[in-house]
Amino acid sequence: MKLHVVGIDLGKTVFHLVGLDSTGRAVIRKKCSRRQLLAFTANLEVQLIGMESCSGSHFLGRALREQGHEVRLMPAQYVKPYVQTNKSDFLDAEAIAEAVQRPRMRFVPIKTEEQLDLQALHRVRERWVMRRTAVVNQIRSLLLERGLTLPKGRSHVDALLPRILEDAELRLSGCFRVLLAQLKIELEQSTARIEQMDQVIQKTANENEDC
């Protein structure tokens, strides 16, 4: 069957496909898994395939391009105006098929495997930084409860925490000193992990022109 345009609504395990002919009439509706979808599109004659840019869309977009299809990704907010009131996965797929044909539609470039790798590295690094910040804030909060105020900023905690642990004149219990020492180790390990990730990110970016 030859189609003018296909819209695909992506799910985690199930995909809904709607194909339109040259008059804009929906002539095919199909619900399938990723494997079934790629098997179906392998021999499909279609001028254009549209999808919303979301998790998994870049992988599927590359797979469809390898089959020889023209594939375009769109931000979800630009597809929303074409969605009908009665929401369903097939109606969403049809809205995608309608939206992808619009001359003023904004498209998202399909990321390469290397670009997705770099994106994943940055996301993990961001989570590690947030965890380290949480440790810093907890250290400052625990010390404040014992009358010790540290200036804001990780560098101040890095510099002053060893001195606090070594200062025998501070009225800190043995239990609390052990806890502080454990938090100090956690903070140092977090920083080392982030610095190592920075090196991996830089190496990945240098080795790939698309990144």
Q: Where are these predicted regions, by residue range?
A:
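A detector of single, family-specific signature residues
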Residues: 1-211
